[in-house]
Amino acid sequence: MKVSIIIPVYKVEPYIERCIQSVLRQTYRDLEVILVDDCTPDRSMELAKACIEQSPLSKDLKFVFLHHEQNQSVSVCRNDGIDAATGEYLMFIDSDDYITDDCVETLAKPLENFAYDIVAGNYELHDNGFGIQGAPLGLRGAIMQTKDIAESIKTYKLYCAVWNKLYNARFIKDNKIYFQKRLPYEDELWTALVVCSAKSMYAEQRITYHYEIRDGSFTTSETQEQNLPRCMRVLQSFYNEIEQRIPFLDVDAVNMIEERLIVAVKSAPKDFTPFKTYSCLRQCDTRSWKTKLWAHRSLKNALLHFDQYLPARLGYAYIKALYGTKLIKHRLHTLFS
């Protein structure tokens, strides 16, 4: 079984050799390594190629080099990697991170018995050279229902990052699950669509990935004020994607992922009033009535989300009027806690 490893490359000169060396040392050897040069202005690609050419470990591995004439974003790099991949499974690595020597072997082991849509491993965070506790994978073994996979995202037992997982290539390509160009938090949206479509997953508790926290990175440098519109765009993009995929998605999974993304949006500046937060969420929701009715098809869900069929002020008044009732209590907690 061939595994295609997709590595976008852009401004990672201090880290790229460590990343490539970790791939070269893999105990699992049926690998296709796709490096996508996103028009990096430094020596990252030069160092990567030299590392490959000088290592005797590269002889039995297949390498593919793709080049962008101009910088297009990590999302486009990953999409090009997906299209170029010929392996049965896909894996993404950020080029400033690195994997354990047995990473692919460990993640591929469960696939000897069943062709899971996703296999996820555990990981460790590194901050300035020190290993710190990450968001550990709170799952173990096989999960065979879409709604259970989605619930693991909602309850933070499964991380949203695309790296450190094997994805069934046919499943990804048949469902046309691609990254949106220049969308912030593209991992969140892509993972949301994957788990709303996947029917099986295997969780491996062993650490197989090392993630590097870099000073000044997108996620470490932004403020709450910058975070809000970006999170809103992710939620809006999720709704837009759902609109196009209704017949193929699990409704329970969609509702769980919606709650997970709402939690990200409501991390707004603290001076936001509850109504302003509610209004932001309503702005994101571009779904048609048909899609909303599909998502809320039980009577309980229809009443729980009835505010979404009303203008924003009336909708807010509706959920406030029901505050404290058993039906609405959980949703208010999701929106405003």
Q: What residue ranges belong to the model's regions?
A:
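Structural motif
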Residues: 247-257, 305
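Generic secondary-structure transition motif, activating predominantly at the C-termini of alpha-helices
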Residues: 52, 157, 176, 243-246, ...
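General structural signal for secondary-structure boundaries
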Residues: 140-151, 221-224, 267-273, 294-296, ...
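Nucleotide-sugar donor-binding/catalytic module of glycosyltransferases
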Residues: 1-230, 332-336
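Membrane-interface aromatic/basic loop that binds lipid-linked glycans or pyrophosphate carriers
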Residues: 272-337
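Amphipathic alpha-helical repeat scaffolds of TPR domains
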Residues: 255-266
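Catalytic core of nucleotide-sugar-dependent glycosyltransferases
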Residues: 207-215, 221-251, 268-289
